[in-house]
């Protein structure tokens, strides 16, 4: 589960760099949406990983 959290972190950083950096002007809105989606998935994966190890 920690593996997926790291994958989501990397994807969120890439999407954020493209969306907020203005590199891809036409797809900036999509990149910003993807940033938030993968950021939420990162947090969910981290929480599941922590609860799974606590048992």
Curated annotation (Swiss-Prot):
Kindly list the places in or outside the cell where this protein is found, as annotated in its UniProt entry. Cell membrane
Asked if the Swiss-Prot or TrEMBL record annotates the protein with the keyword Transmembrane helix, the reply is: yes
Mind telling me which InterPro entries this protein's record contains? DUF1328
A Pfam family assignment: DUF1328
Q: Its membrane topology, per UniProt?
A: Multi-pass membrane protein
Q: What keyword terms does UniProt attach to this protein?
A: Cell membrane, Membrane, Transmembrane, Transmembrane helix
Heme as UniProt keyword? no
| One GO CC term on file | plasma membrane
- Transmembrane domains' residue ranges: 4-24, 30-50
- Indicate where this protein is primarily found: membrane
Known NCBIfam families for this protein? PRK13682.1-1, PRK13682.1-3, PRK13682.1-4
Family classification? Belongs to the UPF0391 family.
Q: Which HAMAP family match?
A: UPF0391 (MF_01361)
Protein name, as recorded? UPF0391 membrane protein Meso_3110
Tell me what organism the protein belongs to. Answer: Chelativorans sp. (strain BNC1)
């Amino acid at each position: 589960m920690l593996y997926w959290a790291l994958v989501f972190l990397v994807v969120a950083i890439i999407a954020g760099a493209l969306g907020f950096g203005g590199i891809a002007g036409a797809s900036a809105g999509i990149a910003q949406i993807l940033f938030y989606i993968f950021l939420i998935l990162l947090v969910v994966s981290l929480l599941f990983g922590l609860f799974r190890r606590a048992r």
